[in-house]
Regions:
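Aromatic-rich, lipid-facing transmembrane alpha helices and their immediate juxtamembrane interface loops
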Residues: 2-153
Length: 153
């Protein structure tokens, strides 16, 4: 159920819409957290002990859109995890490239990899494959894990 702030009317959301919205928010927040941890670990490599991590508001819907992959994740679980991880990494590269091009077109892209080796048009870094491999498996787990039942005691 959802109550509209503008009209005060009650609007009923079906279970799938509610699940998708919850997963979108969960993925957006998880993605932000992963990005902040990753960028702060890069600061550590540069010996910047402030460990400052960064992200962008634009990244929330990009990470949140991982929720769209839940049905795909459920079907892929029969494959071995190395195969799934590779497929997910390639899908993330594709999503990163497409979203990066769109954001670049509007001069809003928060990342620029042109100064790094193994970049493609400054939008994706092929050396990030292991990170995207792990991230894909992380989001699979996040979106397919059954909620734990609360014990009464």
């Amino acid at each position: 159920m959802y109550i509209s702030c503008r009209t005060g009317h009650t609007v009923f959301m079906n279970h799938k819409s509610n699940l998708y919205l919850n997963n979108f928010i969960k993925c957006g927040i998880a993605g932000w957290c992963l990005e902040i941890l990753f960028t702060s670990s890069m600061a550590l490599r540069r010996r910047e002990m402030t460990l400052k991590g960064t992200t962008s508001i634009w990244m929330f819907p990009l990470y949140g859109s991982m929720a769209l992959l839940r049905p795909f994740f459920l079907r892929m679980q029969k494959l071995a995890f190395p195969v799934r991880g590779c497929i997910y990494a390639l899908m993330i590269f594709a999503g990163e490239f497409l979203s990066g091009r769109l954001l670049q077109k509007h001069q809003l892209c928060p990342w620029d990899y042109t100064s790094h080796h193994w970049n493609i048009q400054g939008i994706i870094r092929l050396d990030f494959f292991p990170y995207w491999f792990a991230t894909g498996l992380f989001f699979e787990k996040l979106l397919t894990e059954k909620p734990s039942s609360q014990s009464k005691g």
